[in-house]
């Protein structure tokens, strides 16, 4: 079994998915992965489908040299964005795989959240292109490894009002006074 870079806090309530040596650009995939990190699984799936249809963009925050500006990036508080279709499709496949893993484990698929997603560089694949005057230049591809961990989100239960009212702070002086009154 392959080791993940992060162990889930509660392994019984989480599921994993990974892909190795995927023929998709590392930089585009990294930016797309950062955009869906922490999202609910249904929201992430809808977002990635919208990216392929160019209805929502992926904000390019780190690898943004020469990336043009787009109005859709304003939703993310950013100016530069693109629509990396292939990266979105690969991540959609990974989410689908993680979802089926969750069903197999018996988890509630509708409450899954992307807790951890990581994109690493894979060994480059080498090709060549022919240039003027008999020269040859490299024509490399930048594949990547992707891993993700999805976790069932617990519902936050509000505390009863009685307990909240009881926890009022009392100074040491008042506490001693109350004890003295109780003795008498």
Curated annotation (Swiss-Prot):
Residues 167-184 have a biased composition (Basic residues). It is found in: Cytoplasm. Residues 160-184 are annotated as: Disordered. Transmembrane segments: none annotated. One of its GO terms (cellular component) is cytosolic large ribosomal subunit. GO terms for molecular function: RNA binding; structural constituent of ribosome. Keywords: Cytoplasm, Ribonucleoprotein, Ribosomal protein. Expressed in pancreas, lung, colon, cystic duct, gall bladder, kidney and liver. Expressed at high levels in the well differentiated pancreatic tumor cell lines HPAF, COLO 357 and Capan-1, the moderately differentiated pancreatic tumor cell lines T3M-4, AsPc-1 and BxPc-3, the poorly differentiated pancreatic tumor cell line MIA PaCa-2, and the pancreatic tumor cell lines of undefined differentiation status such as SW979. Expressed at lower levels in the poorly differentiated pancreatic tumor cell lines HCG-25 and PANC-1. InterPro entries: Ribosomal_uL22 (IPR001063), Ribosomal_uL22_CS (IPR018260), Ribosomal_uL22_euk/arc (IPR005721), Ribosomal_uL22_sf (IPR036394). PROSITE patterns: RIBOSOMAL_L22 (PS00464). Its main location: cytoplasm. It comes from the Eukaryota. The keyword Lyase does not apply. Component of the large ribosomal subunit. Belongs to the universal ribosomal protein uL22 family. This is Large ribosomal subunit protein uL22. It comes from Homo sapiens. The lineage of its organism: Eukaryota, Metazoa, Chordata, Craniata, Vertebrata.
């Amino acid at each position: 079994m392959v080791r993940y870079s992060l162990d889930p806090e509660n392994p019984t309530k989480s599921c994993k998915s990974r892909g190795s040596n995927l023929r998709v650009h590392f930089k585009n995939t990294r930016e797309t992965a950062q955009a869906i990190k922490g999202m609910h699984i249904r929201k992430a799936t809808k977002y990635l489908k919208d990216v392929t249809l160019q209805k929502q963009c992926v904000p390019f925050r780190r690898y943004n040299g020469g990336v043009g500006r787009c109005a859709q990036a304003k939703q993310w508080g950013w100016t530069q964005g693109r629509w990396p279709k292939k990266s979105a499709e690969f991540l959609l496949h990974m989410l689908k795989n993680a979802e089926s893993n969750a069903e197999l484990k018996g988890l509630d698929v509708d409450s899954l959240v992307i807790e951890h997603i990581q994109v690493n560089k894979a060994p480059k694949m080498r090709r060549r292109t022919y240039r003027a005057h008999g020269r040859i230049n490299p024509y490399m591809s930048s594949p990547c490894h992707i891993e993700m961990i999805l976790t069932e989100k617990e519902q936050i239960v509000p505390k009863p009002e009685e307990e909240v009212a009881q926890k009022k702070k009392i100074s040491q002086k008042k506490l001693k006074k109350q004890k003295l009154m109780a003795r008498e």
